[in-house]
């Protein structure tokens, strides 16, 4: 069996790791970086770009660049590029394909299986969407695990003592906090809470809004309508946020940000850490609510926490760390890289599934309560939040009207009392119920949550034995046929990318040969015969003409022809230079010919001195 990789599919950056010799190792991408921007771009020529290359071209191509797609997982959001609509699953699959290809290049073998992490507070539809993205990318998703749990695995894999840890995970677009108990190989999640709409992007947005307001005050120009300027502001805001984690102030300088009747306008501002803290104070406070909730759900006090683990790039923000320090009374642990720890934990879970890691038991929880709608639009909970998974729970319900022969089961996820205020996971009908007065039929509704946190629901009429089952795929989910179509589409694009890369290599080789031929002709000067030089010149021009077209076979053929004539001439000249009697221009000429002594040469007298006699 091949290696199972661990993937942290992030909002801003993604990371892939693998278990090697019992150790979790981060796999660098083809560009040499340990994390890959979760950015997908589409060039004007239709080429698909993923990662750093996509991020680099975002300023000049904002309309065809997709960022932070993770925020739309599990929704019916679509990205329109040219005439095609892309789902969040398809865009995420492009990022996963890049990570898969990087892992294959590193390992030197095909990769078909992965453990992918999701925010602990992801709903069922968001988890299902992540699994679908893996399938589209050509990966069998062996397990979906929560990001804080993965971080705890990476932190606690070699810790022998029992301890209670709090994982504070502030990523690019999501926030989670989980409390776990570690000991004797058991990683048990006691409680989890979070906010799927809060992350580093929101901190960037605060800086962007401040820059726009300040610039408008100075110049009267509102930059919001300029997409290219907005992309530059976004990059500058992210850079400023990162810099303010290490310095007390940073300069934001964006020349030629726009132009007015007075000429080009430049943005030049200084943002202090104090001002940044003021701008983002409400966001920091928003992370503390779920932190307090998780402690309350786990029935713990701040003093009961032994270690605080920080995860996600935005957890480096000094105000964030100060808020945690103040509330929990503990210095956050900084012995792990917050950008890589989740992928490393996923790789450990992959090792558990692959049999490489023994003695580890992971007991995760469901982040939100699950239930069904009952009479009066009430949400009746079957599985409360923070229930350890996998789990199964059943409850018996009855009909609301006389002679009712079918019921609709409306499956819900959330903490609100009214069904309308929670998230709908799905609906299905159980029909064939024997007519009877209301309250008589007995309908057993059963919920199963698997280890991936994905929900399966069944309803059974106890009198007739009629049963209906569904695996929840939310109304925004993809059908099996859609996933298969997207898999084929992704494979086709992968083949197109491979062909495009091959074409680039063929053209590069041809360009290199043209350059080599021109250099050879220049270096040889008058040493080569005119006929030989004409041959090279002719072959070179034919290749240059072929390069103007798109026939790759023709380019290869002409490259080979030019290579042959250049090689033949080089060989011919080398043989001439090496031959006995060759002139002074030969590489080693003169040794075999008549060695006539020049009359003007005077032989020098010399005396051999015995070194031994000189020693005293």
UniProtKB/Swiss-Prot annotation:
Keyword Ligase among UniProt keywords: no
Record field: compositional bias (Gly residues): 583-593
Keywords noted in UniProt: ATP-binding, Chaperone, Nucleotide-binding, Phosphoprotein, Stress response
Coiled coil: none
Stretches the record annotates as Disordered: 576-616
Molecular function GO terms recorded: ATP binding; ATP-dependent protein folding chaperone; unfolded protein binding
Annotated family: Belongs to the heat shock protein 70 family.
NCBIfam families (UniProt xref): PRK00290.1, prok_dnaK
Name of the featured protein: Chaperone protein DnaK
Organism: Heliobacterium modesticaldum (strain ATCC 51547 / Ice1)
Gene: dnaK
